[in-house]
Amino acid sequence: MVMEALREEGVDTVFGYPGGAALNIYDETYKQSYFRHVLTRHEQAAVHAADGYARASGKVGVAFVTSGPGFTNAVTGLATAYSDSIPLVLISGQVATSLIGTDAFQEIDAVGISRPCVKHNYLVRSIEELPRILKEAFYIARSGRPGPVHVDIPKDITAAVGDFDYPTEIKMPTYKPTYKGNAKQIKKALEVIAEAKRPLLYLGGGVVAANASELVRKFSAKTGIPAVETLMGLGVLAHEDKNLLSMVGMHGSYAANMAMSETDLIIALGVRFDDRVTGKLSEFAKHAKIIHVDIDPSSISKIVNAHFPIVGDLNFVLEEMLEKVAINEQNLTSWREILARYDALNPLDYKDSDEIIKPQWVVRETAKILKESGKDAVIATDVGQHQMWVAQFYPFDRPRQLITSGGLGTMGYGLPAAVGAKNAMPESTVVNFTGDGSILMNIQELMTATEIGKPVINIILNNNFLGMVRQWQTFFYGERYSSTDLSLQPDFAKIAEGFGGAGFVCRTKDEFRSALKEAMACGKTAVLDVRVDRFEDVLPMVPAGAAIYNMILKSKE
């Protein structure tokens, strides 16, 4: 029945790792031919790969794991997807119904554990309810505010035989997302937009999740309102869009953060006012009225009070707003001049060097070489300084181009997510930017990438540190580098070769250029160990608890 449900849902790829309680599912997987099963080397990686597949494709990602430690290994993947509203369905095996509650071998209360980090979960209690549950799981995962759904199936139920009657419609009276925005609220929002002197578009991952980027681009082009993007919203507007200031937040640009501080109207689309964006709440956008459009009513006024809340799907709401939106062009001209001065005062840049490789240079040079290749590129990251440098310096030009863990900040996410993205976008060049700390957390997935013949390029910005933690220690902990020095390291290039891939060590700019071009041409999963400046900082930086306009702009001497 699981196989038939996946066929009905159009699933073409599943990521997973087998075990005793999931053997019936895997036996049926062996017999079918309509989806590909990708055997990862760890259950956490299976869920991250399903997550990366979902982000890159816009489809629901699917993963299989077994009970007990198989499931607990998957929890970080669920929490990562939940934090970023990523649609996926995790199907876990469970001990037989008669053994539940007996502390049986590899028994764990999976639904109890998953409850805080999924949109919904199920413990299947009979074969008769399995088709309905699977239908609901996919519907819940992709509808409204997307998210992961967990389905736990005892082994006796996967062994049972029954009639497969897949529902043609969903009957969930207590779950009915609101898609069409309130007309009166939309009218009020349009009125305040017309009156605004310093309006600002605040764009987040919800725009990507709703596949509403084209409408946002039309809205931006029609109004000319300056815009900022969150980490999860990068690519909603193209990098070169004249209205886009850049990323906002803890490591956002000076101009973007000052715009958020001085705006008199925030038009918030698909965002949740995360602490990394707001900074000190009492100082956040003190002069601004807020229009907040989101399909999830629980996100509105949760952190920052919305003066004009609109619950609805961005596609429906923006279609209505586009017809009637008007702005005061004279006000906008003055506002743009103010923002241009901020950008000129502290542009997002870095001091390059001919003596040592700067990590920002690596990001920009990678973008340049990828563009010259003429192929589409998908960029994955792990979590740390490299993630922020990619966000700051990679010129994203479309949604779903950046695959990164935003809300949970999961180290070890990048490589398996890149494997998932490559399965979703096999014709695209997939590059994973990682650090010498993050890469070791799921490095076994080099084997997965090699086995399935879908190469991923991994660029390690190697500074012999847990770089972001080291940066905090530099600024806020008296330069006491407790447990962040990673000077003792493995040979990453040889590890890559041991997994059947290609390995490169890059100590100069020329070596990096040559290695990246060779990696793109060799047809193997590759690792580029790029030795970068050890003490380079990600700047600007808003200290924890500080106002968003209170930025550190220079490294400590």
Where are the model-predicted features located?
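N-terminal alpha/beta PP-like core and its mobile active-site loop of ThDP/TPP-dependent enzymes
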Residues: 1-327, 369, 455-458, 476-478, ...
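Active-site diphosphate/adenylate-binding microenvironment
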Residues: 2-3, 7-12, 17, 25-29, ...
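Active-site nucleophile and cofactor-binding loops and adjacent substrate-binding regions
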Residues: 17-19, 38-48, 63-70, 125-126, ...
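A general structural motif
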Residues: 43, 102-103, 176-188, 248-252, ...
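Thiamine diphosphate
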Residues: 91, 99-100, 105-106, 300-303, ...
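Phosphate/pyrophosphate-binding active-site segments
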Residues: 128, 164, 191, 287-383, ...
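Generic enzyme active-site microenvironment
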Residues: 150, 292, 380, 433-434
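A glycine-rich phosphate-binding loop feature that marks nucleotide/adenosyl-phosphate handling sites
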Residues: 152-157, 382-385, 533
